[in-house]
From Swiss-Prot:
It holds the Pfam family NB-ARC. Residues 1000-1070 are annotated as: HMA-like domain. This is Disease resistance protein RGA5. Belongs to the disease resistance NB-LRR family. PROSITE patterns: HMA_2. It comes from Oryza sativa subsp. japonica (Rice). Residues 182-466 form the NB-ARC domain.
């Protein structure tokens, strides 16, 4: 039996294959009697396995048959556990301790559950016991008279062939029939409705398109608001996470809602009110179920006459009315789609357009659409099913008959959603159903990453590789098919249109939840001790303990039998990992306030010899065992948290495919032994040894590599590292994705990595070389040889008009982010045929100098431009040929202005932008954002360029010297920015402003590597700064040295962009420092080649919500 593990067959397929392997494995010498016993056990299992398969395809089996199938499935798990216990050898030390620390030496390898290797006679007796259990199951099959399969007719199962046309999620073209609602809501969002805070609601039944409309409005109008947030609520929302998600977005921080773990609900409310005071904000709460949730959240939103708006979506009209204060004018009741709009959605999904629908299917299509009742979710679900095999007449006939019989003449909209989703589910092949039912491990409304699900499905054994495709390709197909059928709801989509994260629509959740219980596949326990699923023999257990400190596991669960554990909640509520002896999948996601307890003890995992997947995330410190090489089956190790120490034998895990640790983590020497690795993130070039850098070249199976640089080094050290990594990359022939990012750099550094481009594999698909450490002098010509490249993000100091020709050799490029520090004398001209499949183009430069010829970028959908304007510049004719971009849908522009730019300049630039957009034959979604182009948008090299142009000795970059009035305003703000003990430092501040060399220490909230990189980049961009360093035990002290730095302005900038910032010290530097921490010269010597692209790190405000786990749209 080649079947994978599944909800219907249990572990029968993997068990039979495992017995086969035992019988033929040359390294396992079985005594003849034991071998014969295993052969007989296998024969007995095959016999009942055939009956199990026959009964599993019956739509509604009898109670006796269901009972027997449950018993056999459980027996398959039990026997596989016994086989694993008998034949899987333990190696390594107890509890992960080094051999030198053990009190008692262990002379022989141990087996889980046994103190020593069992004797052959013991194993033969155990095999005999297992055979007896199988015979009993076979006898019950006969006693229950289940030999002849009976029950209702089996559902028709249709295997997807991959031809379904996915919807382009998030694109306005997919929203049909909502023009009236959009017009009304657009007016409500505008200033015409008055300055007071307004609350509106979109109401309608499940599947009618409320979330899609709210997302569309958010995309269109977010730029009009200084603060904005889009969050998703669930039926039992954790208010701490919900409010934390809103706060993280309105503050525009690169942090998740979990970063507010120690904050109480009241403190989050207070912080939100303080931050939103006197600001215009837009808050969208999607899927509100209870007014109690609204009453708490609403207390965080001040009404300050700032034209702020709040939008909610709800299924229940009474909830919407209470949120809107019973103002019926602000209730938008969505109605089902009309006939024409329904046809547009349906035919576009199944055939591409109505014109491509065969004539013989027109009538049956109309019948199906009539039964769908105009509900978008129902239409998409049925269209996704039919689109998998659009030319299969049996499928069309089956769908039509099912809908006609189950929905009758006047079905309710609720019945329509239920039956269409039920049809889509029943038509799924068993492996697809298994993967869907597995999502019962996650809380209702949880955002799930596609990459995580794929690895978990693989670790659970839900897929079996074949000669044509490996496991990763198969699970990718499963995921995409569940999305295409409307069963999984996309949340985050990248620029290529690929779904990165998803959630279960609550209507789908309601459909599959009973199936979780019926098939005894998973069991969920929440903080209220509510049990979802069977409480007898649990194989997959999910604990949701996020709302109480004293939640405990319910009684009656045998933890030693659990194969998969997912924990969501408080650290001090998590059961001991050591009790779960047979774990294969371990998911730990910590929420809420942990108090003083921050340490997560994962030392017992060294005894989980069947473990295949381990992921943990949260604001905790993870303690791993000193030795981990006993986990011979481990495929995925992802720790999104701080690690106290990495096991020294990590490099000896033979089956590890995916390794992800936070940057700044030093891996043990010998990484070249990890030849099975496919994913490595992050590998820190500054913290790892040169031997490890060279060892990377041995990882010939590596496909995804994310490099970071988080430690300072001498120029000599940088060159050694560069040579080592260049040599290694030249040998990674299977590499598909390469990313190099700054990480949590503690010093501003720069080195030329042009040599890397010349050695990367020609089949590379993704290349991101991010500033500040990756700034090319010129665009490397060798980039044009990477013909398979799909994603390219790169920054250069100087980009010549002829360099664009290097990109014409990239026929597969779909995403291009390009930043140039210096504008060319001419224009960048994209000619006919250039970048034929490009969908997203982001271009940043000091001046806008682009031209598109007819035929250029024929598939470009989104265009993002970043440039500066200055006083009295001419703004017309800065962007040529936008009308030639025939597929363009969105254009976003971010324009930097300095203090010399007047209102007339802004109006002129805005008028020119609108005029350019209006040239396009289509009605484009457009946005224009103004930012201060002080040092936020300039780079040190740009500043030097402007200094030379102006002949200024003081040199203030793009900005002219502050006026006396501005200086006085800053002096007035000194008291609010200084810490209390520095209230008498005004004289030192004045000395700093006069140009004397000054050392400034600021305490900044920098919880992660990205936030540190951002804070350093901000500080480094300020006029007069010579060096920037991060110090302090918690890495929260920013030390800035330079001349003429305004401390008040520096702190104000950091406070605005990073949240919390406090000035701790300002002192005059008498003489040049000569020692770095660690004894190296040049502590305060500024690296003049440091540059920061506003492209990826200094983007104010972000183009979309930072919270990826609740973000309805992705702009990357």
């Amino acid at each position: 039996m080649d079947a994978p593990a599944s909800f219907s067959l249990g572990a029968m397929g993997p068990l039979l294959r495992k017995l086969d392997s035992l019988l033929v494995a040359p390294e396992i010498r079985l005594p003849k009697p034991l071998k014969e016993g295993i052969e007989l056990l296998k024969e007995d299992l095959e016999e009942i396995g055939v009956s199990l398969v026959e009964h599993s395809v019956v739509d509604s089996p009898t109670h006796k048959a269901r009972f027997w199938m449950d018993e056999v499935r459980d027996l398959s798990y039990h026997i596989e556990d016994c086989i694993d216990t008998m034949f899987s050898m333990r190696s390594g030390g107890d509890d992960g301790k080094p051999r030198s620390e053990r009190r008692h030496k262990v002379g022989r390898a141990k087996i889980d559950g046994f103190s020593k290797k069992p004797k052959p006679c013991t194993r033969m007796a155990r095999i005999a016991e297992l055979r007896a259990l199988v015979r009993e199951a076979s006898e019950r099959l006969e006693r229950y008279q289940l030999g002849d399969v009976c029950g209702s007719s089996s559902p028709v199962v249709f295997t997807a062939d991959g031809r379904a046309r996915p919807l382009h999620h998030g694109v306005s073209a997919n929203l049909v029939g909502v023009d009236e609602f959009k017009t009304k809501l657009n007016r409500w969002l505008s200033d015409e409705e008055g300055p007071h805070l307004k609350v509106a609601a979109i109401v309608g039944p499940a599947g009618i398109g409320k979330t899609a409309l709210a997302t569309e409005l958010y995309r269109d109008h977010r730029w009009q608001f200084e603060c904005r947030a889009f969050v998703r609520a669930s039926r039992k929302p954790d208010m701490q996470r919900l409010l934390g998600g809103i706060l993280s977005q309105v503050q525009r921080r690169q942090r998740s809602s979990d970063a507010y773990a120690d904050s109480t609900v009241q403190s989050l409310i207070d912080n939100l009110r303080e931050h939103l005071q006197d600001r215009r904000y837009l808050i969208i709460i999607d899927g509100l179920w209870e007014t109690a949730v609204w009453n708490i959240a609403n207390s965080a939103f001040p009404d300050v006459n700032s034209f702020s708006r709040i939008l909610i979506t709800a299924d229940i009209e009474q909830v919407a009315l209470e949120c809107c204060g019973y103002k019926y004018d602000y209730i938008m009741r969505m109605e089902p789609l009309g006939s024409l709009d329904s046809k547009k959605v349906f035919f576009n999904k199944v055939f591409g357009s109505e014109d491509q629908c065969p004539p013989e299917l027109k009538e049956v299509s109309n019948t199906i659409l009539e039964k769908c009742g105009g509900l978008p979710l129902a239409i998409i679900s049925i269209a996704g099913l039919l689109g998998s095999q659009p030319e299969n007449p049996v499928l069309w006939d089956y769908v039509t008959k099912y809908l006609c019989s189950s929905l009758g003449t006047n079905p309710t909209l609720k019945d329509v959603v239920k039956e269409t989703l039920n049809l889509s589910y029943n038509s799924l092949p068993h492996p697809f159903k298994t993967c869907l039912l597995y999502l019962g491990m996650y809380p209702d409304g949880h955002i799930m990453l596609k990459a995580d699900l794929m690895k978990q499905w693989s670790a659970e054994g839900f897929v079996s590789a074949n000669e044509a495709k490996d496991t990763e390709e198969i699970v990718d197909k499963y995921f995409d098919e569940l999305v295409n059928r409307g069963i999984l709801e996309p949340v985050e989509i990248n620029k290529n249109g690929k779904v990165l994260s998803c959630t279960l629509h609550h209507a789908v959740h309601d459909l599959v939840m009973p199936k979780f219980n019926d098939d005894k596949f998973t069991m969920s326990v929440d903080y209220s001790q509510t049990i979802t699923g069977p409480s007898t023999m649990v194989r997959r257990l999910s604990l949701h303990f996020s709302s109480t400190r004293y939640a405990t596991k319910p009684a009656g669960i045998i933890l030693s039998r659990v194969r998969s554990l997912a924990f969501f909640g408080l650290l001090n509520c998590m059961p001991c990992i050591g009790e779960f002896k047979l774990l294969r999948v371990l998911i730990l996601e910590f929420w809420g306030s942990h108090g003083e307890q921050r340490s997560l003890n994962l030392i017992p995992v060294c005894r989980l010899f069947q473990l295949r997947y381990l992921k943990t995330s949260g604001d905790v410190v993870v303690q791993l065992p000193a030795q981990i090489s006993g986990l011979q089956y481990l495929e995925t190790l992802e720790i999104d948290a701080r690690v106290s120490a990495v096991p020294f034998d990590l490099v000896h895990l033979p089956n590890l495919l995916h390794l992800q640790l936070q940057d700044e983590t030093k891996l043990p020497d010998g990484i070249g032994c990890m030849r099975s690795l496919r994913t490595l993130q992050y590998f820190d070039l500054g913290n790892n040894s040169v031997d490890n850098l060279r060892g990377l070249g041995e990882l010939t199976n590596l496909q995804d590599l994310h490099l970071s640089y988080s430690a300072p080094s001498s120029n000599e050290g940088l060159m050694i590292n560069l040579n080592a990594i260049t040599s290694s990359l030249s040998r990674l022939s299977n590499l598909k994705s390469l990313i190099l990012s700054p990480g949590a750099i503690s010093m501003v550094i720069f080195f030329d990595i042009s040599s890397i481009i010349s050695v990367v594999p020609v089949f590379l698909q993704r290349l991101e070389l991010l500033p500040p450490i990756c700034i090319f002098c010129r665009l490397p010509k060798s980039i044009g040889q990477l013909h398979k490249l799909c994603i390219l993000k790169v920054s250069v100091r100087e980009l010549l008009t002829t360099d664009i020709d290097n990109l014409t050799g990239l026929p597969s490029l779909t995403v291009l982010s390009l930043y140039a520090q210096t504008a060319p004398e001419g224009r960048f001209i994209f000619k006919d045929g250039t970048l034929p499949v490009l969908k997203y183009f982001k271009f940043g430069c000091g001046e806008l100098c682009l031209a598109f010829m007819a035929g250029a970028m024929p598939n470009l959908q989104r265009l993002k431009l970043v440039f500066n304007i200055r006083k009295s510049e001419k703004y017309r004719h800065t962007l040529f040929g936008i009308e030639h971009l025939v597929s363009l849908q969105d254009i976003a522009t971010r324009i930097g202005v300095d203090t010399s730019t007047g209102e007339s300049d802004r109006r002129a630039a805005e008028s020119a932008f609108k005029e350019t957009v209006n040239k396009h034959p289509r009605c484009l979604r457009s946005s224009l954002q103004w930012v201060v182009s002080t040092e936020e948008e300039s780079h040190p090299l740009e500043k030097q360029h402007h200094k030379r142009e102006k002949g200024s000795s003081a040199g203030h970059g793009v900005l002219e010297k502050e006026s006396v009035e501005d200086s006085e305003k800053n002096t007035d703000r000194v008291q609010t920015l200084l810490s209390p003990q520095l209230s008498n430092m005004e004289s030192v501040v004045e000395s700093a402003l006069t140009g004397q060399r000054t050392k400034i220490v600021v305490k900044v909230h920098m919880p992660c590597g990205k936030s540190r990189a951002k804070a350093m980049a901000l500080a480094a961009s300020v006029n007069g700064v010579d060096s920037v360093e991060i110090t302090g035990e918690d890495k929260d002290r920013l030390v800035v040295v330079g001349r003429g730095i305004d401390p008040v302005r520096l702190v104000a900038l950091l406070r605005e962009k990073c949240g919390l910032a406090e000035l701790l010290m300002v002192e005059l530097v008498e003489k040049e420092k000569t020692q770095l921490a660690g004894g190296k010269k040049g502590a305060y010597k500024k690296h003049p080649t440091y540059n920061l692209s506003p492209f990826d790190y200094v983007e104010y405000p972000p183009s979309a919500p930072i919270m990826q786990d609740i973000n309805p749209c992705s702009t990357m």
